[in-house]
Amino acid sequence: MEQAPNMAEPRGPVDHGVQIRFITEPVSGAEMGTLRRGGRRPAKDARASTYGVAVRVQGIAGQPFVVLNSGEKGGDSFGVQIKGANDQGASGALSSDLELPENPYSQVKGFPAPSQSSTSDEEPGAYWNGKLLRSHSQASLAGPGPVDPSNRSNSMLELAPKVASPGSTIDTAPLSSVDSLINKFDSQLGGQARGRTGRRTRMLPPEQRKRSKSLDSRLPRDTFEERERQSTNHWTSSTKYDNHVGTSKQPAQSQNLSPLSGFSRSRQTQDWVLQSFEEPRRSAQDPTMLQFKSTPDLLRDQQEAAPPGSVDHMKATIYGILREGSSESETSVRRKVSLVLEKMQPLVMVSSGSTKAVAGQGELTRKVEELQRKLDEEVKKRQKLEPSQVGLERQLEEKTEECSRLQELLERRKGEAQQSNKELQNMKRLLDQGEDLRHGLETQVMELQNKLKHVQGPEPAKEVLLKDLLETRELLEEVLEGKQRVEEQLRLRERELTALKGALKEEVASRDQEVEHVRQQYQRDTEQLRRSMQDATQDHAVLEAERQKMSALVRGLQRELEETSEETGHWQSMFQKNKEDLRATKQELLQLRMEKEEMEEELGEKIEVLQRELEQARASAGDTRQVEVLKKELLRTQEELKELQAERQSQEVAGRHRDRELEKQLAVLRVEADRGRELEEQNLQLQKTLQQLRQDCEEASKAKMVAEAEATVLGQRRAAVETTLRETQEENDEFRRRILGLEQQLKETRGLVDGGEAVEARLRDKLQRLEAEKQQLEEALNASQEEEGSLAAAKRALEARLEEAQRGLARLGQEQQTLNRALEEEGKQREVLRRGKAELEEQKRLLDRTVDRLNKELEKIGEDSKQALQQLQAQLEDYKEKARREVADAQRQAKDWASEAEKTSGGLSRLQDEIQRLRQALQASQAERDTARLDKELLAQRLQGLEQEAENKKRSQDDRARQLKGLEEKVSRLETELDEEKNTVELLTDRVNRGRDQVDQLRTELMQERSARQDLECDKISLERQNKDLKTRLASSEGFQKPSASLSQLESQNQLLQERLQAEEREKTVLQSTNRKLERKVKELSIQIEDERQHVNDQKDQLSLRVKALKRQVDEAEEEIERLDGLRKKAQREVEEQHEVNEQLQARIKSLEKDSWRKASRSAAESALKNEGLSSDEEFDSVYDPSSIASLLTESNLQTSSC
């Protein structure tokens, strides 16, 4: 459409060529009105009865003009001009002029603009409404009726899509003259005039010989002659295309038909040829390739062209048209015909290839756009994940600061422990001093007895007194022997405890060695598993099996959650029982206090009675010397009693100080327990952060191009957080071990204090028992918390193992279930032990030691379970690393797929370039068929490479299957190791049963001790009776006897009794103080138990929430796996589509080769029929009738659709 204004300008002489005009019969106004293209009506008035053929030959200078008709200037004529490679919008390729100008070279308005600008059928605005014109649509060529011109234009545009050409491709060459051609015609015929009689004398100025000065100004001046050569080439090719129109006029004249019918058939032939072949040839070919050889002399140009052969009917028709009205030789006309047909062949080949290339190019551009959009989405996702990195680093810094603070607190605790050790040594020294004093008092008592023996006389009263003294001494000895027996029993129990400690330590060491060996073996196995599982993620069947196993694992986690809830209920019931036990001990302490007060009252009364008796004895004594001696002895004994009382008071003060220290240490233990809870809360926070990290990982897994780097960073951060968690757990364990050491030291100090008196020892033992119970409760709470933490860690690890192999997940689930069962059995055993402890509450001295021993055994069992859980955690961490590596491998594979897609896109672009080169080569000549073959070989090589890659992938899948079999064997071996662990747990249960038997034995011993206590109380009562008897005897003897040596003996007995009373008072005070302390401790323990129960409930709620979160994350992980599987399938489909595109390209190359071979064979066959000279109009019509043209067009369409 851009050329329409240019064609409307005044035109000078055009290029070399021939213009053929048909002079028609008069037709109706309606019919002739439709023949206009530019809106003008032909002038039919002056030449209503003229007809014939007018041939106009244009010379070198544009002067000669030959017309073969009736001699009149006007007349309906149709000019056909066929050009070579021209711009898309050139409408002058086919021209029909309804008026023959008088002399187109003498005036500027020789060719009317409408006629020149509207004759091309390629213009969308062109139309034909004549009754005898056939449609130009290739789909309706076989049809009889006319069709809408819009359909004709659109079909032509669809057959040969227009490609926009730059402005430089417009034919801007000046119209050179053809004087040389006309002069040559004149010289060959001996100066005989051709066409019109007169030579045109008027010469056009040079500026009118150009089409457009504005267009010529685009090119430099030095290309002017080159454009002249091109313009001559256009006119030469134009003439060869359109010369067949003339012969269709002859049968119209002979049969008295409308002259438009023959024209319509010739116009149809011209239209489908030009519409389907000229447009792609202009857009695809380089003008340099289609620059035909042209010279100013048309005859010499025709002689140099070698005809490749064409259809004989067309050749005859064009030959007749060129021959009529011309005086040229027969050889020159035949050369023109062959040249016209030669230019039509490459256009036929170009038409089929252009539509295929455009379709393939559109598909490739769509794929490139889709890949670019995916890349942009991945970049955006990566930018979203970057802010989470800063928060994780900040959390790691906070955790390191907390670890440093905990280390400082540990150092302070060490200093406090050393100070407590020093205080315990001081207390031990004081106890030794008290023992020395006791031995001194016993020696003094012995001396007094010896003195009494010397003073003894034959009187019967003295003998009675001696007997009483002997009896009292025997009783005292029996009491001392009972005390020694009790102390020996205590020493035996302590030795047994030390022996049990050593055995437990040895067993713990052996257990640690076994666990270390198993851990090393497991690390080696897991390393091999990690190496073997790196390439297993592409297997579809394995992914499906893993998904099913993960659903089963979620159900197992739910069962574990129910078991943990049952365990928490069990712990609550235990806490309630312990609380009841503490209440019972409190009642017992109150009862003891009341008994002690009663004993103090009785002793006070006895002391008052003895003092009154002594005063009476002094008043009645006659011998002053004996009285003085007795007074001195009494003073000495009173001073010794005062010293003993002072020592007792100092010991009591030391005991109070020790009790305060114990309370401080208990407070420290509470602080440590609170700190442990804080650490557990921090662990929960860390678990929350880990859950957030997992969510980030799930979001990062959606980014195929970026997920590898993100996964490695998240893995490192997760490992750092897990190391911090492990460090905090280790610190907690170390704190607990140190607390246990301190408590053992406290027990040793209590054992030293037990060497004083039996009552004080019993009370201290009871205190130890209560503290041991508290410790047991704390340890039970810590064990439950650790078990909950281990369960949470196991769940977290199991969540991370969603992407691991199926058998590894099943094995870990079984191991965890077995450990949970072992923990349940241990809990049951603990419950049985606590029931035994409830039965042994009344046992004062031996029960607490047996309970301590059992607690130590339970601690060992808990440590074994902790070690097993730590081993599981290490295994889970290894599996986490393996999962991260698998994710990294999957991301690398995704990148490989993306790179393959980019390579395929690059390969497609290269294939497009090759297709373009192949099209140009096919348009240029058959010689470029070798390059197409080379391209075909390259494509075959690429297909072979892709097939080899597929085979390599299959081999890698087979290798992965073998590796999975090896993994199954390793899993079976680990299961056997788990069975061994079960056996060790059974051994531990047997050991606990043995401890239970020992508890029963200690119970019997406690009953024996109780019976001994009752015997001692009976002895005490008997001694009191004897004392009363002695008092009565002393009163009766004082009435009728003088004071004698027996008085001193009685006074010594009184002193002994006073000492015993004082000892009883001191014991009473100690009991009261210890009872008060025990009451306070019982209250504190009850409060602590309530707090711990609340904490356990909170942990239970947190566990339930965490399990729900784990379920949700498992579902999300399954969805992510399905999404990745879909992406992988999509990538495979794209690769398969690329294979199909390659196969289509190969098929297209083969079809093009077949077409070229077919056309070569056809040209060879037609060259054989070249000399037959078929010139009849009927034969031409039989070859170019609508049915044959439709068959040709449908054949080209079939070729296009097959590509």
Curated annotation (Swiss-Prot):
Q: What is the lineage of its organism?
A: Eukaryota, Metazoa, Chordata, Craniata, Vertebrata
**Could you give one GO CC term from the UniProt record?**
cell junction
Basic and acidic residues composition bias: residue spans? 207-231
Q: ZIM: where is this motif?
A: 48-62
Q: Does this entry carry the keyword Phosphoprotein?
A: yes
Subunit info here reads: Homodimer. Interacts with TJP1/ZO1. Interacts with SPEF1.
- The name on file for this protein is Cingulin
What's the main place this protein lives? other
**Polar residues composition bias: which ranges?**
232-266
Give the organism the record lists.
Homo sapiens
UniProt-listed InterPro entries: Myosin_tail
